[in-house]
Amino acid sequence: EMCIRDRSDISEKIFAPSGFMKVDADYSGKPYEDWLASDWPKTYRNPSYPNIFAVGIAFAPPHQISKPRKSPNGTLITPSPPRTGMPSGIMGKTAVLSIHSILKSGENSGIATASMSDMGAACVASAGSGLRKGSAAAMTMYPVVPDYVKYPNTGRSLDDTYGEIGLAGHWIKLLLHYMFIYKAKGRPGWFLIPE
């Protein structure tokens, strides 16, 4: 239960039934056929309490990212979008830029946006050991949340969505490891390294 000064319960304004925080998304519960990329949040602010932000796995997705299906034994399969790693970094940066703008210039000036229907993501997953043997999968996806209005056949840009398996993924993962540590330490030029 979440209360404000007058002790009134504000939980329903803050949290979805799933326990995740509500943000500027469309939570109307419409059927799959009516889902749109624009249902997804852009600012990650709670509409009732705009001084509260939720990014990454903290915010409540408005719906899954693909058609709900069932396994042969009847288990419901409801894919959710990736809300960790690269997407979380972009969302976090968006929230920080908005908070900075609010503190510096006033309530609604310069609110940053980054919808998952407009952002891409990359992932490198190691599947072995060593930099001379084994393999890794390197994938990119754009946009993270499918947009069937912009890309009618697949919901995604086929030029920007692909994957490869091979040794290069290990080298990429090693390079990213050192780049992110460099960025986290705030070394010169850190801001040029993407999320």
Language-model segments: residues:
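C-terminal, flexible cofactor-proximal segment of oxidoreductases
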Residues: 84-87, 94-195
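FAD-site-proximal beta/loop scaffold in flavoenzymes
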Residues: 5-88
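Functionally constrained cores in energy, signaling, and assembly domains
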Residues: 3, 61, 132-134
